[in-house]
Design a protein with these regions (language model features):
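PAPS-dependent sulfotransferases, especially Golgi type II membrane carbohydrate sulfotransferases
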Residues: 1-42, 215, 219-362
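Pre-Walker A (Motif I) flank of P-loop NTPase domains
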Residues: 45-47
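The Walker A (P-loop) glycine that initiates the GxxxxGKT/S ATP-binding motif of P-loop NTPases
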Residues: 51-52, 180
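Walker A (P-loop) phosphate-binding loop of P-loop NTPases
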Residues: 55
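A conserved segment at the C-terminal end of the G1
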Residues: 59-72
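PAPS-dependent sulfation machinery
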Residues: 77-177, 245-251
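Short catalytic-loop micro-motif centered on adjacent basic/acidic residues
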Residues: 176-180, 291-293
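Conserved phosphate-donor/acceptor-positioning beta-strand/loop module used by diverse small-molecule
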Residues: 180-182, 191-216
């Protein structure tokens, strides 16, 4: 959501909530005690994590999957006290505003409201793992990393219970957690270790079109952050390091060091990042990870949605997914020459893309 959509009170609350990681964790501890019995009765089974580089269709896929009542996910309603959703829901109830859709800051036609799914869990990872967010980059979570912080493992699992509990009521009885978080590409291995029955869904796009979209959004958010300082502050606090002044790419296999100085205002930066990301994910593909071609979703959406329903192991709601078939539309195409892409790196990208297509569930 754009920074101009926040009142003075909204900004003050945001700054209070993010003034100290300890404040939110202390409130979460209070919440644990207040709702202990109800939280303890909730099981976390078969969570679904939708993740990839941004601009790959993660938002649309999560909205579609999230339309099925068995899922619970983060929404803007949990802001700014992300770590204590039950407590904040109770406190903010009398002041809750009507949910009205508006185009998100990306300017891509996607609508958001207070009830839209968003990647707020990244702020929790950031609070517990600050050493992974190192200067201008993010360091991936490797095998065994999850066990290094049993405190976080317990906190995070408990947090998922809270969200599931929060979404219950009326005709909704969600039993599973749904995550949309591009930052999770840095920790797919850890997520499998933490949730052996979890499902990781990774959409991908043609590298040229994807790189063009990434470059466009980086320039878009660079301008937004320059124009609206609170927008930069807000996105930094919630862990959105995808674009603009807050950019922190994931340093898969040390690609940032191997590439040398590369300007993120150039297409080659994003092409190298694309290659590093998907080579890493293919090499470290876990048993519970599925790749999904976004272009094929647009070409045959009903077939794709049927495959997605099987991948995420829906208990019910398959017909609900199919009602969203007309939302999949071919994205804007880009030209490699106009983007000034290195032909050697581009050949490598096309080879990686061919492997992804072979692995795609559609």
């Amino acid at each position: 959501m754009a920074a101009d959509g926040f009142s003075v009170t909204d900004r003050l609350l945001h700054r209070l909530a993010f003034s100290s990681a300890g404040l939110q964790q202390a409130l979460a501890d209070i919440e644990d005690r207040l709702y202990a019995k109800r939280i303890g009765a909730v099981e976390v089974t078969r969570p679904v994590f939708v993740t990839s580089l941004p601009r790959s269709g993660t938002t649309l896929l999560t909205e579609v999957i999230g339309s099925v009542p068995e899922f619970a996910a983060h929404t803007y309603r949990e802001m700014p006290f992300l770590a204590c959703p039950l407590l904040w829901h109770q406190i903010s109830g009398p002041f809750r505003r009507e949910s009205m859709e508006r185009e998100r800051a990306h300017g891509d036609g996607m609508k958001v409201s207070f009830d839209s799914v968003e990647a707020f869990e990244e702020a929790l990872w950031h609070a517990f793992w600050p050493s992974r967010y190192r200067g201008d980059r993010i360091i991936p979570w490797e095998a065994g990393t999850a066990g290094e912080s049993p405190e976080f493992d317990a906190f995070f699992r408990n947090h998922l219970r809270k969200l599931i509990l929060l979404r219950r009521g009326g005709n909704a009885e969600p039993s599973r957690y749904l995550s949309k978080n591009n930052g999770n590409i840095a920790r797919t291995i850890s997520l499998q270790e933490m949730f052996p029955d979890g499902i990781i869904l990774v959409p991908f796009r043609d590298p040229v079109d994807h790189v063009g979209s990434l470059l466009h959004q980086h320039r878009n958010f660079t301008a937004i952050h320059r124009r609206e300082p609170f927008a930069r502050e807000y996105m930094r606090d919630i862990g959105h390091f995808d674009f603009g002044a807050n950019l922190k790419p994931v340093n898969f296999d040390g690609w940032l060091d191997a590439a040398g100085p590369v300007d993120p205002d150039r297409g080659d930066f994003w092409l190298r990042y694309w290659c590093a990301t998907f080579e890493y994910l293919l090499h470290h593909r876990t048993a519970n990870m599925s790749f999904l071609s976004y272009e094929r979703c647009c070409e045959r959406p009903r077939l794709a949605l049927t495959a997605i329903a099987s991948v995420v192991r829906l208990d019910a709601g398959r017909e609900q997914l199919l009602t969203h078939a007309d939302r999949f539309r071919a994205p804007r195409a880009y030209d490699a020459q106009a983007l000034g892409l290195d032909p050697v790196v581009l050949r490598r990208a096309h080879q990686i893309h061919a492997r992804l297509l072979d692995a795609s569930v559609v």
